[in-house]
Amino acid sequence: IGDEAQPLIIGERINPTGKKRFKQALIDHDIDYIISQGLEQEKAGAHALDVNVGSPEVDEVELIQEVVGKLQSILPLPLQIDTSNVEAMEKALRMYNGKALINSVNGKEETMEAVFPLVKKYGGVVIGLALDEDGIADTADGRVAVARKIYERAADYGIAKENVIIDGLCMTVSADPESALVTLETIRRIHDELGGNTILGVSNISFGLPARELINSYF
């Protein structure tokens, strides 16, 4: 990851959000189906896999450990531990082989105080969402300010800048056509002004629109 590197594609299909079949697989404890989503994404060219098994109907703390273990036993791809459950995050990081991506922290003090100690302890790379107690800023200025705060607080915990990747937040253009420009300006300034690396949930841009693959690719 860096200025000279090609974009890193993180597969997002191991996630129940908006996926009825996957959510049912979690409820049914259908590990084979969950793993199949990882295999299909590897075949499609993903460089890493997001892993989110959070659902009210399951024990996320136990399930994320099982899924991470199974995926690592079968696939060579790095995994992104995606959870807002701090206990699940720590359990997954404790048994993870290698340096995990951690999704995520944000500019809220409470969240940084909970997540940064785990990043430092287990040596991962954390995704920093450019939002804080005031929500998501409508301007690049606001988002860059949050990114700067995240970097500064990470440094307080002894976490190097290269181990923090900022998500400039990609919003759907169907709700706000100008939001794409704000996102692009945010990531440009994070690179130019803060010297940081960035990540985006690119598919968010097309939510609720037809021809989503075309819109995602163009963006």
Regions found by a protein language model. Name each.
Residues I1-D167, M171-F219:
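Domain-level signal for soluble alpha/beta catalytic cores
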